[in-house]
Structure formats: C-alpha cells, structure tokens
From Swiss-Prot:
Keywords: Bacterial flagellum, Periplasm, Signal. Pfam families: FlgI (PF02119). One of its GO terms (biological process) is bacterial-type flagellum-dependent cell motility. Belongs to the FlgI family. The gene is flgI. The lineage of its organism: Bacteria, Pseudomonadati, Pseudomonadota, Gammaproteobacteria, Enterobacterales. The basal body constitutes a major portion of the flagellar organelle and consists of four rings (L,P,S, and M) mounted on a central rod. Assembles around the rod to form the L-ring and probably protects the motor/basal body from shearing forces during rotation. Its main location: periplasm. The keyword Signal applies. It comes from Salmonella arizonae (strain ATCC BAA-731 / CDC346-86 / RSK2980). This is Flagellar P-ring protein.
Length: 367
C-alpha cells in the first residue's frame, strides 16, 4: 500500500513538472471580438522627384484631376502633366474591436505605381472602406518610411523597402461597427490551437469556479460559457474567467520548415531515434565560351568562324553515412543535427527522410 502511494506521488510530481499554468486569456479569444480590415485608394504628394511617372500610370493623373476638380480647380482638357512628386497608393488598416468614433488607428501606405520612394511624402485625405463599401475611417498624414536609398551615375544603394510606409495614428474612425456583445446569454471562447484536452481542462476550470453547467466544450477549439445578461455583467464575468489559470500539458512535437527561406524551427518536444544519414551535395557547373578563328591573311578571302566550346563540371561531396544518436531533448536534437554538417536547405530533405524512416518523433509542417 505504501509502495503504491509512493509511486502515485512520483507520477504526480512528474506530471506537475511537465505541465505549467497559463491564464485562459492567453489560450483563448472571445468569438466575435476581432479586427476588421479596411482599405482605401489615395494620393501621396510632396515626394522629392521620386513619384509615379504619370505617362506610364494614367490612373495617377486621373485621380489627381478628380481631386483638383472637387477643390474647384479645372485642368484644361488634353493637358499632359509631367508630375514627379505624386504617387498613387493603397492604404490599409485594421479596425479594432469596440472602437469608438474619434479614435485613431495606424495605417499602412503602399505604392501601386512605379514610384521610386515614398520617403518624405504626405498622404492626402483618403476614405477607408470595409467589405460593405461603407466608409469607416479617414486617413491622412506624413508617411514614415523605414528604408533608405541613394543613386547616382547609374549606381544605386538601397536598404529595406522604400515603396511602403506607415502613419502612426494616421486614421480617425468616423463610423462605429455594430456589436452583438451582451445581447445573448452565452459566449464562445475559441482556443488558439485545437486541442480536445485543453478544451476540457478550460471547461472543468470554469465549472469548478462558477458551478457545474457554466461551461461546455463544443469541440476541440470552442468552449461555450453561460453568462449573465447585460454588458457590464458580462464584462465582469469574462474578466474573472480570463484570469483563471489552467495547467497546460506539453504540446505536440512539431517541426516547421519554411521552404522559401530555408528556415527550420522546432519546439522542445521534438525527439530523435538512432539512425544513419547520408547526404550528398551535387553541384553542376556549365561554362560556355565562344572561340573566334580568323584567317591569317586579311585579303585572302577567308571567313571568320565562331565555334562554341562548352565545359560541364560535375562535383559531388559528402555521401558517407553519418550516425545520429537518439536524442531526448531539444539541445541534444540540435547538436545531433549540427553534427551532420548540413545546410538548412539540406536539412529540410534530411528531416523529411528521417520522418519517413520513423526516426523523427514529430509532426513535420512545411509552409
């Protein structure tokens, strides 16, 4: 009996060390409480000769003519305006939940023509619309561009992107979105990651604190919570629930590979079994040259002959089997993979092969 209790205590201690507590607010979000996208089309002025080439971007000239006509300025028909300080841009923003009229939000400005840079430009008043084509905000202000560049004599140097920028607090909300918060007696909590175990643990924690039947797990991502009626009562109720702590069990072992950049990211649950890996690097170099043969006598009537000469060089390095030891923690996994001496691009193929062979104990996700 004492031996059984001692073993049970050891098991509980091991589970406690593997799990850690996190707040429900860090694991879930409230369904319906989300951002909405806004978009608009406008003009940026004040550029130092780095704007659109209006002959190649007729929409810039058309937009400028429409704006001037609204300001009472008429441009004679057929006028060919060669402007270099104006650029047509797209403006995007995120409408935050529960935003009120008069609140300011950040906007992102991106060139849609052939402007060289938006640095130093000013965005003119641009209406921002939602998917329902209603105007919800107005954007205007000076653009902050994070990049820098210079060009002279056919040479140019550029750091970061010059055709996009940001305006902090650059848009003012003019229309409020209708909200259904507080209208019903239930609220759905959506888990950030689908997990049946986590959904049930959140349900049990809420039921222990608020009484049985207060929460129900609908699926691996949704927990439905019964709340009192009224906005203020629901705000207080959610504030208490979101600050509850839940023991988080270890996550699924996962390796994420970015096929475009070659980056490989893995969590600490990834483990390796013993295996042998051989990876050969094959490189092919093709060099083509043109040999010109001319006659020795300029007036002898001979012809110049051009003969191509192609040289192909094929090299293969590596290829020997490398032993990979069984690894039980992330540091050991990293050391074992680094011992292969493979580049990130090679590592992508190696990890796929190791998973197929059953040596990689993790889910492999390629983005």
């Amino acid at each position: 009996m004492y031996v059984f209790k001692a073993l049970a205590g050891i098991v509980l201690a091991l589970v406690a060390t593997l799990a850690h507590a996190e707040r429900i607010r860090d694991l879930t979000s409230v369904q319906g409480v989300r951002e909405n996208s806004l978009i608009g089309y406008g003009l940026v002025v004040g550029l130092d000769g780095t704007g659109d080439q209006t002959t190649q971007t007729p929409f810039t000239t058309q937009t400028l003519n429409n704006m001037l006509s609204q300001l009472g300025i008429t441009v004679p028909t057929g006028t060919n305006m060669q402007l270099k300080n104006v650029a047509a841009v797209m403006v995007t923003a995120s409408y935050p939940p529960f935003a009120r009229q008069g609140q300011t939000i950040d906007v992102v400005v991106s060139s849609m023509g052939n402007a060289k840079s938006l640095r130093g430009g000013t965005l003119l008043m641009t209406p921002l619309k939602g998917v329902d084509s209603q105007v919800y905000a107005l954007a205007q202000g000076n653009i902050l561009v994070g990049g820098a560049g210079a060009s002279a004599g056919g040479s140019s140097v550029q750091v970061n992107q010059l055709n996009g920028g940001r305006i902090t607090n650059g848009a003012i909300i003019e229309r409020e979105l209708p909200s259904q918060f507080g209208a019903g007696n239930t609220i759905n909590l959506q888990l950030n990651d689908e997990d049946f175990t986590m959904a049930q643990q959140i349900t049990d924690a809420i039921n222990r604190a608020r009484g049985y039947g207060s929460a129900t797990a609908l699926d691996a991502r949704t927990v439905q919570v019964r709340v009192p009626s009224g906005n203020s009562s629901q705000v207080r109720f959610l504030a208490d629930i979101q600050n509850m702590e839940v023991n988080v069990t270890p996550q699924d072992a996962k390796v994420v590979i970015n096929s475009r950049t070659g980056s490989v990211v893995m969590n600490r649950e990834v483990t390796l079994d013993s295996c042998a890996v051989a990876q050969g690097n094959l490189s092919v170099t093709v060099n083509r040259q043109l040999n010109v043969n001319q006659p020795n006598t300029p007036f002898g009537g001979g012809q110049t002959v051009v003969t191509p000469q192609t040289q192909i060089d094929l090299r293969q390095s590596g290829g020997s089997l490398q032993s990979v030891r069984s690894s039980a923690n992330l540091n050991s996994v990293v050391r074992a993979l680094n011992a292969l001496g493979a580049t990130p691009m090679d590592l992508m193929s190696i990890l796929q092969s190791m998973q197929s062979a059953g040596c990689l104990r993790a889910k492999l996700e390629i983005i």
